[in-house]
Regions:
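Terminal and linker regions of secretory-pathway proteins
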Residues: 2-446
Length: 446
């Protein structure tokens, strides 16, 4: 199951840049980047942290506010297998591609006005192993790479990272997760909680975690898509009611003898199958490309290239001690060796809501990959007390989405929808998401 973003990097040109960034020692300060004029107006550090036999590569952007007191965030991106650069350039980092220069030999970079690094220091991690520049010197480590193994490794990663960055030891610490990283974030957070309890050093000043468009429970997410499609006007009320009766609310694991249900699901698929499920209002690029006059030839070329590429990546997956080929989302991780050993992360959220930390969960209301319906359903299962009932929240006098807050003791869980956003919200509504984060991190209501 791939939770990679539909937005792709300009691979050829940026591979060259990434190789430049990748030629680092354990830590390197990057002061300039191709495509950006002059010195970077923020501190960017790249490097490796060794965890057992694995080398985790990271991009660290120091807060542009007060780095010695501002929050420190470890961000896990989705896929699994998508590089932390996705978060840095596409979501909450201080730089983005200038789309007006995409036809140039080298695309330009521009500063982002709503970067979360204005008020927080962020570690963008390449994880699990095999993602981005992260690698292992032992082939066995790729075989055992899994949800729980990755979370355990990243719990060790952050303590070792802090050992080399002791000036951030006292900063309030948060784990962030996006898309499939939303499943990993609470598992990583629990690793940190348990490590603190066990007296591991350095102690991590954990204050909370947040997840955006979080993959949490496959059954809930898949079964929510049909009610979501009806609610968004994508299927008729007649078809929806008929499918509810024939499938009895279970749309994922349908018995092959239930022909009425299968027929209804086929009709629903006809209505929704060609949508861009990451944002239902956006074009489905796989249908619009390549250009019509080169359609057959281009499609055949793409299919052949992808076939060769996937075989090449799989056969050379055990290359040890280096990263010979960089890709934004490594299919050899997503569809190959990675073990999906956590079917539902709800239990981790239940555990964490009993601890002394705060939580932010947000979704895009036009996301059909992980619908807001499924997220609201598992939040309800946590049996928390509503502290601030469902209401609109605003940015610049306009409704930015809807929110409600749950409370347990003095610590709270804030849930928010982001109006008009897809999967993931920070890619579509940067100003709104920045405002949401700024209020939450400073303990203000949305």
């Amino acid at each position: 199951m791939a939770f990679a973003s539909s937005i792709q990097f300009c691979s050829l040109q940026w591979l060259l840049i990434l190789l430049c960034l990748g030629n680092t020692f354990s830590q390197s300060i990057v002061k300039t980047l191709p495509g950006f004029s002059g010195l970077l107006p923020f501190k960017l550090e790249t490097g490796y942290v060794n965890v057992e036999r694995s080398e985790f590569f990271y991009y660290f952007v120091e807060s542009q506010g007060n780095p010695l007191t501002d929050p420190l965030i470890l961000l896990q991106i989705g896929g699994p297998g998508c590089t932390g650069l996705t978060g840095l350039f596409n979501q909450i980092g201080p730089l983005a591609f200038d789309s007006s220069t995409y036809q140039a030999a080298l695309p330009s970079l521009k500063l982002v006005p709503n970067s979360w690094t204005q008020i927080a220091s962020i570690i963008f991690i390449d994880a699990p192993i095999g993602t981005g520049f992260s690698y292992s010197t032992c082939a066995e480590d790729y075989i055992v790479s899994s949800d729980t193994n990755t979370a355990s490794m990243l719990g060790k990663f952050i303590r070792k990272w802090l050992e080399g960055h002791l000036r951030f030891k006292a900063n309030p610490f948060f784990v962030g997760g996006d898309s499939y990283g939303g499943l990993l974030a609470p598992i990583i957070t629990r690793e940190i909680v348990e490590g603190n309890k066990a007296g591991l050093e350095p102690f991590i000043n954990l204050e909370g975690y947040y997840v955006g468009s979080p993959h949490t429970d496959t059954n809930l997410e898949e079964n929510s898509k049909i009610p979501y499609a009806y609610g968004m006007g994508l299927i008729s009320s007649r078809l929806f009611e008929r499918a509810k009766r024939s499938c009895k609310g279970e749309y994922l694991n349908v018995e092959p003898t239930n022909l009425k249900c299968l027929e209804d699901l086929a009709k629903i698929s006809e209505c929704t199958g060609n949508l861009n499920i990451h944002h239902i209002l956006r074009p489905n690029c796989s249908l619009s490309l390549p250009m019509p006059n080169k359609d057959k030839q281009a499609r055949r070329s793409i299919e052949e290239t992808n076939s060769r590429y996937n075989r090449h990546r799989y056969l050379n997956f055990w290359c040890k001690g280096t990263v010979t080929e960089w890709t934004r989302c490594n299919d050899s991780v997503t569809y190959g060796s990675y073990i999906y050993d956590v079917e539902s992360a709800i239990g981790y959220h239940k555990y964490l809501t009993d601890t002394r930390i705060k939580v932010l969960i947000y979704t895009g209301d036009h996301d059909m990959r992980v619908t807001h319906i499924s997220t609201e359903e598992w939040i309800k299962s946590l049996n928390l007390t509503i502290d601030d009932d469902w209401r609109a929240w605003y940015i610049n006098g306009q409704i930015a989405g809807y929110t409600e807050t749950y409370k347990k003791s003095k610590y709270s869980l804030t849930y928010a929808t982001v109006k008009g956003a897809g999967h993931s919200p920070t890619e579509y509504k940067k100003a709104e998401c920045y405002g949401m984060f700024e209020r939450w991190i400073n303990n203000y209501p949305l």
